[in-house]
Every structure is written in structure tokens, then in C-alpha cells.
Amino acid sequence: MKLGFVSAILDQSSVEEMIDTASELGFQCVEAACWPQGKAERRYAGVSHIDAERGLEDEAYAKYITEYASAKNVEISALAYYPNTMDPDLQKRETVIEHLKNVIRASGRLGIGLVTTFIGRDQSATVEENLELVKEVWPSIIQVAEEERVKIAIENCPMLFGRDKWTGGQNLVTTQAVWKQV
């Protein structure tokens, strides 16, 4: 078993500083945050230690990332991006899905082979309606993962942010019953 962490906790660090920290503390791997470049909407979102789009376009950048981590004896075990892929705002949904697909492609290009993410949830819809939405949203994401030979790991955190948020959270798959249906 390897011990690692999600790099989003080191939100003020560069990719090199994050990998150096992991190495110095004796971690064997990291789940590297890959949010789109720009301002965060919530805590830990917006952290981008690896720029997925750049990793797809710039071969030297992709090689540098993998070689730097390898030289520090730190494996990049997964690329991490946890958006709400079922956001009721269709423009937001389209934007996050396209970035998630690019994170999947980058994971393949970097030889990582794993992306960690959420299913998401339309907080204004019922569980049953969200289960139908999964059937609309996720096939194209899974298709990209299959094409790139990248596995997807789904986190089941309910994403409950506080009393001002709807009690169902922002992630559909938080119970065994819902997991079985998905």
C-alpha cells in the first residue's frame, strides 16, 4: 500500500513545491489537483498543480511533470478534479464536463491512468431525476475514459457546505442504495 494525499490542500504551492513536500514528508504518491486555471468558487476548488490543457498541448511540460515527480520518488497516482457534472446551469455543466474530459485525456498522456472526481447532483431535482440525469451526462465522459484507457474513481463525499445549502448535497452517490442504481 502506498500513502499519499490530495494536493489541493497545498493550494499556495507550485507543482514542484507540492511534490517536494510530499517527498520530504515521506509520501509515496499524490493525487494532483487539476482544476481549470482561474478563481476558485469554493475551498480547495480552483487549485491546479497540473494544467491539464497544457499537458495535452505541450509535450515538454508533460515530460517535465512526470520526470520531476519520478526524480523525487513521488508517484502521481491520479489527477483530481471534483466538479458538479450535473449542475442545473447547463453552461456550467458543459464547461466542467469538457474540462473533466481534458483531465482524463491528460491522465492518459501522462501515463497516470486514473482520474478522481464526483458524479455531481442537480440539487433542485429528486434522487430519481438525478439517476436519469446520470444516464444523460456520464456516457460521454466514460467514453473518453475508455478511449484513453483511464479509470475513473468516484468520491462519495456528500458535499454538504452548510445550512444555506440544500440538504442533499452536491454529490448524488453517497449511499449504497444509490450506488447500486448508478
Predicted regions and their residues:
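Acidic/histidine-rich catalytic cores of soluble enzymes
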Residues: 2, 13, 17, 23, ...
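N-terminal beta1-alpha1 ligand-phosphate binding loop
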Residues: 6-10
